C-alpha cells in the first residue's frame, strides 16, 4: 500500500465515528422529492454543517422545486475536488420504517 493510501485509511479510521454520525443524520432526514419542506430541512442541515467547517455555501431556492445547495472552500494550492449528489430520498416519509439508518453486524443499512 502506498503512503497516500495509508494516509487516507488512517484518516478514515480516525474520523469514522463523526462520519457515521453525519451519514446517520443525513439519512434520518427523510426527503421525498415532492416534499418541499423536507428538502428545505436537509438543505438547512447541510448549510449548518458546512458553516461549522468554515466553508462558503449557498442555498438556491426555486419557485416550483425544492432547493439546491452548494458549498466550497476557498482556493488552495491543491487541486479542487467536486462532490455532487442529491438531497431527496424519492420515497415517501416512513417508507423505510422507524429507522431509516441502521447499523447491524458492522454494516450500514
Identify the function of each model-found stretch.
Residues 2-109:
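Acidic/His- and Gly-rich active-site-bordering loop/insert found
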Amino acid at each position: 500500500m502506498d503512503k497516500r493510501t495509508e494516509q487516507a485509511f488512517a484518516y478514515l479510521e480516525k474520523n469514522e465515528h463523526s462520519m457515521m454520525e453525519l451519514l446517520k443524520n443525513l439519512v434520518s432526514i427523510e426527503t421525498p422529492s415532492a416534499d418541499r419542506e423536507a428538502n428545505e430541512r436537509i438543505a438547512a442541515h447541510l448549510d449548518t454543517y458546512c458553516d461549522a467547517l468554515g466553508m462558503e455555501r449557498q442555498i438556491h431556492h426555486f419557485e416550483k422545486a425544492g432547493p439546491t445547495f452548494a458549498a466550497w472552500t476557498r482556493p488552495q494550492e491543491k487541486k479542487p475536488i467536486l462532490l455532487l449528489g442529491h438531497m431527496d430520498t424519492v420515497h415517501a416519509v416512513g417508507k423505510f420504517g422507524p429507522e431509516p439508518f441502521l447499523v447491524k453486524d458492522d454494516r450500514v443499512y
